[in-house]
Every structure is written in structure tokens, then in C-alpha cells.
């Protein structure tokens, strides 16, 4: 049986589909066309309690996802992702609402 946090931070196939369509089936960084399975990048990382919800997920090809997680330009990639999500969702988007809190699930 999965813990509440594990379930809350997972990205469901339904969420991947929503995110992939929102992102025009492309990596938000390089605009490379990718399959729906690439709609799997958390803005607030799963290890930090980042929820598997569209507001916290974006589409990134393997190369850009690695750069966003570990690359030398990590901060620049993170800024692009944050601006992308903030521009899409507007004033309703905020970091606090993207983090799992016990009892939310």
C-alpha cells in the first residue's frame, strides 16, 4: 500500500495528458516534440513534497530535464520553468500550493 505522500506526489497518466496538451506536446525549454511520457518534470521536486498536479508539472525532453535537475545552468532552467507556469496559471499560482502537506490527500 502506498503512503499518502507517495500518492500525492505521483504524476498520474491523466495529469501527464493534461500537461502534455497544455505544453503543446513539446519540451518547454527547447521546443522538441516529445511523447506524453515526457510530461513528468516536477517544478517543486517530488523529494521536496512536490505534488503531481498540473500546476507543478511541465514537459521536458530527457536532455533538458537533466539540465534542469543537475546541469550547470540549473538556475536558468528553473527560472524558465517557474516563469512558464506562473504565466500560464497567473496570480493563482504559488509555490506553497504545490507542496504536499499531511492531511491534504
Say what each PLM segment does.
Residues 1-5, 35-36:
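Major-groove DNA-contacting interfaces characterized by cationic-aromatic clusters
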Residues 10-39, 61-63:
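Short cysteine-rich loop/turn motifs with clustered Cys
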Amino acid at each position: 500500500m502506498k503512503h499518502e505522500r507517495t500518492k500525492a506526489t505521483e504524476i498520474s497518466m491523466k495529469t501527464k495528458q493534461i500537461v502534455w496538451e497544455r505544453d503543446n506536446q513539446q519540451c518547454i525549454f527547447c521546443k522538441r516534440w516529445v511523447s506524453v511520457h515526457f510530461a513528468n518534470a516536477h517544478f517543486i521536486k517530488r523529494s521536496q513534497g512536490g505534488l503531481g498536479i498540473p500546476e507543478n508539472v511541465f514537459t521536458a525532453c530527457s536532455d533538458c530535464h537533466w539540465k534542469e535537475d543537475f546541469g550547470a545552468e540549473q538556475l536558468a532552467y528553473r527560472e524558465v520553468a517557474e516563469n512558464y507556469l506562473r504565466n500560464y496559471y497567473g496570480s493563482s499560482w504559488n509555490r506553497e500550493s504545490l507542496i504536499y502537506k499531511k492531511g491534504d490527500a
